[in-house]
């Protein structure tokens, strides 16, 4: 993980984040990951998918930002997009509640899978604030340096162009609100879609419809939140 051509990173992000790859925290993070691999630990998502959120959604294409915390830590789940799982994997409980709100808000049929890649391809930056995790060990890579990198991503997006939508669900995501210029963007907050909190304000928040209305009011095409069958 340096700023050279070995980084498989979409060009606009590579340029915008070039200085981050030279920061001391990145060297420490790289060494931590090297040691984890050397110790035989299984790390998710697979290496080529760590930057999937950035590679799927170039900086100029970002319309909506959804923040998650860290990747799913079960086999074949994480693929670099927050809340999303790879095809063929059962839909996680928080995503089930996201689908329930989509159905309630926009009458979108609940899909038979949990892969949100089509959202990312349309301009939804689906960013976890920690980009790796050890198998079966939730939050095991929190505080290891990724938070500095993803904080900078949020700042870059906020500064790059106006009239974006930030969906901040739960206390962790809302802790990043200070990185967003709310005078330029629409920031929508609610409790997390987890089964522990979804019925305390996530279900019924109307965020998907409100996001599209804001985009259209500012001359941007809305997101098609429907997911293709897989």
From Swiss-Prot:
Entry keywords, A to Z: Cytoplasm, DNA damage, DNA repair, Hydrolase
KW Cytoplasm (keyword) present: yes
One of the record's GO cellular component terms: cytoplasm
Stored InterPro entries: UDG_fam1, Ura-DNA_Glyclase_AS, Uracil-DNA_glycosylase-like, Uracil-DNA_glycosylase-like_sf
Main location, first listed in the record: cytoplasm
Superkingdom of the source species: Bacteria
Active site per UniProt: 70
Any GO molecular function: uracil DNA N-glycosylase activity
Compartment annotation: Cytoplasm
EC number: 3.2.2.27
EC class of the enzyme, as a word: hydrolase
S-S pairs: none
A biological-process GO annotation: base-excision repair, AP site formation via deaminated base removal
CDD domains the record matches: UDG-F1-like
Catalytic reactions on record: Hydrolyzes single-stranded DNA or mismatched double-stranded DNA and polynucleotides, releasing free uracil
Role of this protein: Excises uracil residues from the DNA which can arise as a result of misincorporation of dUMP residues by DNA polymerase or due to deamination of cytosine.
Membership in a protein family: Belongs to the uracil-DNA glycosylase (UDG) superfamily. UNG family.
Protein name per Swiss-Prot or TrEMBL: Uracil-DNA glycosylase
Species this protein is from: Pseudomonas syringae pv. tomato (strain ATCC BAA-871 / DC3000)
């Amino acid at each position: 993980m340096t700023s050279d051509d070995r980084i498989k990173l979409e060009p606009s992000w590579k340029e915008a984040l070039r200085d981050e790859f030279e920061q001391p925290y990145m060297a420490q993070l790289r060494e931590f990951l090297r040691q984890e691999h050397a110790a035989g630990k299984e790390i998710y998502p697979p290496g080529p998918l760590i930057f999937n959120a950035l590679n799927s959604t170039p900086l100029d294409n970002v319309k909506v930002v959804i923040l998650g915390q860290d990747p799913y830590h079960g086999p074949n789940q994480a693929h670099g997009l927050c809340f999303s799982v790879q095809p063929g994997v059962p839909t996680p409980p928080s995503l089930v509640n996201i689908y329930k709100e989509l159905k309630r808000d926009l009458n979108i049929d609940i899909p038979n899978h949990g892969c949100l890649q089509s959202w990312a391809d349309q301009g939804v930056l689906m960013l976890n604030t920690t980009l790796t995790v050890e198998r079966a060990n939730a939050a095991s890579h929190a505080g290891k340096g990724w938070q500095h990198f993803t904080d900078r991503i949020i700042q870059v997006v906020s500064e790059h162009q106006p009239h974006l939508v930030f969906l901040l669900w739960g206390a962790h995501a809302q802790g990043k609100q200070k990185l967003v210029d709310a005078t330029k963007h629409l920031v929508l907050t609610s409790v997390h879609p987890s089964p522990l909190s979804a019925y305390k304000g996530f279900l019924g928040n109307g965020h998907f419809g409100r996001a599209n209305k804001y985009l259209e009011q500012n001359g941007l095409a809305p997101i098609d939140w429907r997911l293709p069958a897989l």
